[in-house]
């Protein structure tokens, strides 16, 4: 019997999970308490999209395979010694092995399939049988911090859009987008922070209401005319969650000859079965059809995606700055016959890659104490250590003022190779001397400079043609394991869906110890350095210059790097 024919072991409406706060340990040390708390934090109802189903974000991105596996992971982390390592296979704890104190306490592999079988059809069959779990990026690797996790990256993208297309001034301009889930929900706040107004189309009213409660969206509308009136009449940037179907609304704007200034999308188009509502379907009808005829759902969803992408292309032809925001909607439309679906660029090659060349990406940390003051103190420390970056300081000020913490207090801050280790050492010292009430964990999104291969997103259009080479995230995971990250993860299919990406993650616990300081020195240098290495190897001059300045040893490039010092 499959788990969908019987009672679904992934669903338990009686559960409410929240991470412990304070200094009292359930585990034997902070090195095992840290992954325990972050796993639980991923399932906090203030953090996760559907916590009763173990779904954290991104369609069906889960923290554990089922509730039995979750309970067993918790049990093992509570008894795990500091010379043991827990292995987790697609959300299931499968082994505990002797290692050493500087090895990772947890090693995670999620959603990985042999390439020939790396598609949604095969994954869904395994998923039905309880043999796999979709880990997305930070869901199954236990370092999701709510929508804040993508706010700064989205903000940086919109700032870059304003610079490239509007001479740096977004005043009076507006963005059209779709999706207000765990990732897409960051768009309205990021957009208004960057000076744009925004209409974000969402078919699930509960998601709009959640973004209203948490301050990520300003107003709700139930018709396009109402949404347009709100942004037209406002003297300041305003965001509107519009209840509707993205394909319908995007097409209506084309028909009415209304052209936004910027067009993008963050629906869960990467997962046509679970993540995208076909035109003309209700939420309840879609839920029923997923149980009755999965193929029909996928077919209808992809057909609607094609309609939406065609509308995006039409709006682009009328002058809208149009970009793919990494959900693989262009690929889905291409498969449905929209031959020029890739005529608008992905956000990474268009706006983010120069940052990746310097190892700059979504560095994040969380306060295991649960006390917001610990985050505010680390915010100030970042300003002290990076004094000459007013853009970064402005971000930290806006984040404190406008971003509500979800679950354990956390912060996202895009910094690169030259700063990550320094910040980690400073945070560790703050724990050691008692400035912070409990240890800090430092991690990142898998969307980072050296940790992902995703030809339709992070590695789209690499200058040497190496878009699909996935050796790089494997090397990143191996190096972070060797360096002593507290937990390391290796996933497949995050962001863009099965068959289209491989990526790795790491988290390191700053517990104030000298051993932690040594691990931080290795991990928080090596991790971003792999991104600089990867881009230098692909031929990017910015990356080569950074490699030379930071003294990286890249055997095939060292002679060239000497000339750049």
Curated annotation (Swiss-Prot):
Cofactor list: NAD(+)
Localisation per UniProt entry: Cytoplasm
HAMAP family linked: HutU (MF_00577)
GO biological process, one term: L-histidine catabolic process to glutamate and formamide
UniProt-annotated catalytic positions: 413
InterPro entries: Urocanase (IPR055351), Urocanase-like (IPR023637), Urocanase_C (IPR035401), Urocanase_central_sf (IPR038364), Urocanase_CS (IPR023636), Urocanase_N (IPR035400), Urocanase_Rossmann-like (IPR035085), Urocanase_sf (IPR036190)
Protein family (similarity comment): Belongs to the urocanase family.
Native species: Vibrio parahaemolyticus serotype O3:K6 (strain RIMD 2210633)
Gene3D superfamilies registered for this protein in UniProt: Urocanase like domains, Urocanase superfamily
One matching Pfam family: Urocanase
Protein name: Urocanate hydratase
Catalyzed reactions: 4-imidazolone-5-propanoate = trans-urocanate + H2O
Record function comment: Catalyzes the conversion of urocanate to 4-imidazolone-5-propionate.
GO cellular component, one term: cytoplasm
Cofactor binding mode and count: Binds 1 NAD(+) per subunit.
Subcellular location, principal: cytoplasm
Binding site for NAD(+): 58-59, 136, 182-184, 202, 207, 245-246, 266-270, 276-277, 325, 495
Keywords from the UniProt entry: Cytoplasm, Histidine metabolism, Lyase, NAD
Pathway in which this enzyme or protein is active: Amino-acid degradation; L-histidine degradation into L-glutamate; N-formimidoyl-L-glutamate from L-histidine: step 2/3
Protein EC: 4.2.1.49
UniProt-recorded Gene Ontology molecular function terms: urocanate hydratase activity
């Amino acid at each position: 019997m499959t788990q969908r024919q019987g009672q679904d072991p992934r669903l338990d409406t009686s559960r409410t999970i929240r991470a412990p706060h304070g200094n009292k340990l359930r585990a034997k040390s902070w090195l095992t308490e840290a992954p325990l708390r972050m796993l639980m934090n991923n399932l906090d109802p203030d953090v996760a999209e559907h916590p009763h189903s173990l779904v954290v974000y991104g369609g069906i991105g889960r923290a554990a395979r089922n509730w039995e596996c979750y309970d067993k992971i918790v049990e093992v982390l509570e008894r795990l010694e500091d010379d043991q390592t827990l292995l987790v296979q697609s959300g299931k704890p499968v082994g505990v092995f002797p290692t050493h104190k500087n090895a990772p306490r947890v090693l995670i592999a999620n959603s990985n399939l042999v390439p020939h079988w790396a598609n949604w059809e095969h994954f869904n069959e395994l998923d039905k049988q309880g043999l796999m779990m979709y880990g997305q990026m930070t869901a199954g690797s236990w370092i999701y911090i709510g929508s804040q996790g993508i706010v700064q990256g989205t903000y940086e993208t919109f700032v870059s859009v304003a610079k490239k297309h509007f001479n740096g001034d977004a005043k009076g301009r507006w963005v059209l987008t779709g999706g207000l889930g765990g990732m897409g929900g960051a768009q309205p706040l990021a957009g208004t922070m960057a000076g744009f107004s925004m209409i974000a189309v969402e078919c699930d009213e509960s998601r709009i209401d959640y973004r209203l409660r948490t301050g990520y969206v300003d107003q709700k509308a139930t018709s396009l005319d109402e949404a347009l009136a709100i942004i037209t009449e406002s003297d300041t940037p305003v965001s509107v969650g519009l209840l509707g179907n993205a394909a319908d609304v995007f097409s209506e704007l084309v028909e009415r000859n209304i052209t936004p200034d910027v067009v993008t999308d963050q629906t869960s188009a990467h997962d046509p079965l679970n993540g995208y509502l076909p035109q003309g379907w209700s939420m309840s009808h879609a839920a029923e059809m997923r149980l009755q005829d999965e193929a029909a759902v996928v077919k209808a969803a992809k057909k609607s995606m094609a309609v939406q992408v065609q509308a995006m292309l039409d709006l682009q032809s009328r002058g809208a700055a149009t970009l793919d925001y990494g959900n693989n909607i262009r690929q889905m439309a291409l498969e449905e016959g929209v031959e020029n679906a890739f005529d608008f660029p992905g956000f990474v090659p268009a706006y983010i890659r120069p940052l990746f060349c310097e190892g700059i990406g979504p560095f994040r940390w969380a306060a295991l104490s649960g006390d917001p003051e610990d985050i505010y103190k680390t915010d100030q420390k970042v300003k002290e250590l990076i004094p000459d970056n007013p853009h970064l300081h402005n971000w930290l000020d806006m984040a404190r003022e406008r971003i509500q913490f979800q679950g354990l207090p956390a912060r996202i801050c895009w910094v690169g190779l030259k700063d990550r280790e320094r910040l980690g050492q400073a945070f560790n010292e703050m724990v050691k001397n008692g400035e912070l009430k409990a240890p800090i964990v430092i991690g990142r999104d898998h969307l980072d400079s050296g940790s992902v291969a995703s030809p339709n997103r992070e590695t789209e259009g690499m200058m040497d043609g190496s878009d699909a080479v996935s050796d790089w995230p494997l090397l990143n995971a191996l190096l972070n394991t060797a360096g002593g990250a507290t937990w390391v993860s290796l996933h497949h299919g995050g962001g863009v869906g099965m068959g289209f990406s491989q990526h790795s993650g790491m988290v390191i616990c700053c517990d104030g110890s000298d051993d932690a300081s040594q691990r931080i020195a290795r991990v928080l240098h090596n991790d971003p350095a792999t991104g600089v290495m990867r881009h230098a190897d692909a031929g990017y001059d910015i990356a080569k210059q950074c490699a030379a300045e930071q003294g990286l040893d890249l055997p095939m490039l060292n002679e060239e790097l000497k000339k750049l010092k």
